[in-house]
């Protein structure tokens, strides 16, 4: 789309560094080490289509804001998703400023995020969980059951699970090391003995080595496995409605909260940057604690 009736205003050819060239550089040098590389690729491609011909020094906050509003109104994308588009572009510009010295400042830093609605907390009931796991057992995708079991047991994100390499699994200590490239943090995810045993059997059976993906493509071991279609089919067979893979993460958090696990601990397990992100589960925590106290009270109080 053009931002004004005069396309030349926004097509400043002949300058030193066009946005599309910056995106190409970022795609080649940075994307391979990012967790959400495919999502980044799609979003950056969209930005390149819109303003790729503009010199990066001429991209202003108002230019970006105009396109944000276009996404929100014309494409009918949610505010949280529009914020994600802006965050990806901001990551690009931050790299250009701090690492490559190609820009003096990040124009996205002057843009205020859209206020997002409180996140949903859809989680599996016990019966839904049983049906879903049964459906996963019947799937033609032989990794699906273990992927879903790991997701519910750990609260890990989909991309974190599908990009686990064997070297990240610490069998001695019983955890998986997750490296967050974005902020250079490392998260430790405790893993049950039962899951570790399944991991070891899979590694031995498939003769996997340190740099192999635990869940790799059948055609190419250098690529993570795709489970989208298999998971969608399993949901249909299990008759679990209004559910996404990310809701398995909500399921983990909800189960922990209902078991009385402190919110601070849940926040650390999920890798939330702030405790506010975890506060949505407090009502589940307090309700089940109240129920536990009520059970004790009925025994003690006559």
Region locations from a protein language model:
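N-terminal DNA-binding recognition helix of tyrosine site-specific recombinases/integrases
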Residues: 43-46, 54-66, 73-111, 156-159
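C-terminal catalytic core of tyrosine-transesterase DNA break-rejoin enzymes
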Residues: 98, 149, 153-160, 249-273, ...
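Catalytic-site neighborhood detector that most strongly recognizes the C-terminal catalytic loop/helix
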Residues: 123, 180-184, 270-295
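C-terminal catalytic core of Y-nucleophile DNA break-rejoin enzymes
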Residues: 181-201, 210-233
